[in-house]
Amino acid sequence: MSFYEKFTANYPRNATDKFFDIIKDRKFDGWLDSSLNLITDMQLRDADMWCLFVEQFRTNPDIVDAGWRGEFWGKMMRGACFVYSYSKDKALFDVLKESVKDLVAAQDELGRISTYTVEKEFDGWDLWSRKYVLLGMEYFVEISDDAEFNAMVIDCMKKQVDYLISRIGWVSEGKLQITKLTRHWRGLNSSSILEPIVRLYSLTGKDKYLDFADYIVACGGMDVENVFELAYRDEMHPYQYPVTKAYEMTSCFVGLLEYYRIRKNEKHLTAIINFANRVLEDDFTVIGSAGCTHELFDHSTVRQANPDRGDPRAQETCVTVTLMQFFYQLNLITGDPKYIDAFERSLYNGYLGAVNTDGAIDTTAAQMYPELKMVPMPFDSYSPLTAGIRGNGTGGLKPFADGRYYGCCICIGAAGIGVAMKTAALTSKSGVVVNLFEKGEITQPLVSGDNVTLKIDTAYPVDSKVKITVDTDCDKEFEILIRNPEWSVNTAVLVNGNAVTAPKGYISIYRKWVSGDIIDVNFDMRARAIFPIPYGSQILMNKVIWGVNYMVPTFDKEHPSTQNHIAIQYGPLMLAQENRLGYSVDDAVSVKVEDDGYIDIIIPETKTAPYNCAFEAKIPTTDGEYFTVTDYASAGKLWTNTSKMAVWFNTK
């Protein structure tokens, strides 16, 4: 289907968005592409796993533990569709289409596709899982050109939602209140179904789906407070809300963003932007995730260097990927590059760090579930900040009847690399937008219908130089926007050897482009020191009273050694210590920081790290010595103490 025509999920964006993610053709040849290929080979083409996911809808296993096995199919389908939109891998598409066909066949006579029986539905994670079924189908329709098949899938979705509408709505009408249809998070998880409901309205034009979306928004996301009103009023931080579950809350705001595209209520856009800005200010760490208390907002911007938080589960991959998708959507609708600055931090640090490149096995899960068949999974679930290890458990692990298992973070991971490929280059109303700098070739359509090809030659993110060669048959003037990252203080830009100004945000170059024109960009990648933000003590909402669906306040005190930490940023990369680099990450070091806050690192011509890494550097100490670090995403991949690591270094 054409991406932005009428009766597509994206059609409303024509009236509201600044940028458009129309992928004509692109092929990269770097870190992102190799990661995507690994994920595709290790996970997305596994037809047997797709069959297992569908089987859950026939056997209803989630009634036993009010579980979320029903989310796995749609979560992974959405990510796989993002990946396919870049790779155009026919073998992958065939696997996905067969799985969609299989799932449609699992629909019951009431129109339901659920891992819960009718008698036990609307409990636990039922609506949350149905959300993902709908999203998976909606995103498949985007990549499919088979009109007859797509019509069958859309009809399947209509039946699913028609059943929901018949049961869920205003209590005064004898229906069930959506925020009460779960035993968790005061209804945030169930309310996040808003996103696919709005998209289904755009696909069909049926007012009853928009009416249902109106109802969901009016309920406010929680049964104890209206989360959208809290964000609109902007009087408190998300970590102070009555429920602080980062993944589910952000998912609700993604849904509100889709809803804004239809209703165009500026109050809702204000709420969305307020929420995003609060997260960036208060709950966004150096590796681009949120939450030092597993997956809760907890003022992690200031807490991230605390060495003793009591639980190694932090910086959940589900949170990282959901934030990436949120930032991508915010960039589309606002045109603000700060959201891509945040996206890039997540991508090159927290996200790529979670990719299981070394095929490690989660020993924590193996000890807890000795009966399960443990195999390497494509993604880790949590990421360390102070000295710690990867592999601290499989987030959202659910066993299957045959002894296999899966988890929430494993399923969502593919969406991260897929949305990165979408975000890399966009179309604006006046030209094209270059957001990410990956070696390769991008053909991007202009709104006029003409195409422009950008050939990008670079070793970014480990090198500062980016060369972009323009190839176009278009005889019109158009604009090329190049993101100038916030960390690059002194960016230099040349067009055919002539200097142009490089303001913060986007560098706008508007001209009549000729094939062979060259843009040379040199970013300021000096390594800089980052220090913890002192906070003393505070009250958080990060204690869950399980069984009664309550969160209660806790007193949080800054650890005495928190301020004895330092983090080092090189371009978009955070640098990490690792036990295999010839020292213990538990030992204190004394980093030599210059008066201007920068660090004179040495980048060796030949890497010496005993593991594959994207970047390696020597860090000077105050006593004239050096110690070796690598990029954060490459460190810690054994998931054991042998590869213990830290992005926040303990200092003397």
Task: Please provide the spans of the model-predicted regions.
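C-terminal beta-rich recognition modules with glycine/proline-rich loops and embedded aromatic residues
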Residues: 213, 272, 340-463, 502, ...
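Aromatic (Trp/Tyr) and acidic
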Residues: 2-90, 123-147, 187-203, 207, ...
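Short linear capping/connector segments at secondary-structure termini
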Residues: 114-122, 177-181, 232-237, 294-299
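Alpha-helical junction/boundary sensor with strong preference for TPR arrays
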Residues: 87, 107, 144, 164, ...
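Accessory beta-strand-rich segments of carbohydrate-active enzymes
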Residues: 481-507, 512, 521-524, 528
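Asp-box/WD-like beta-propeller blade repeats and closely related beta-sheet repeat scaffolds
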Residues: 118-127, 134, 150-188
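Helix-terminus loop motifs that line ligand-binding clefts
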Residues: 48, 76, 90-127, 283-294, ...
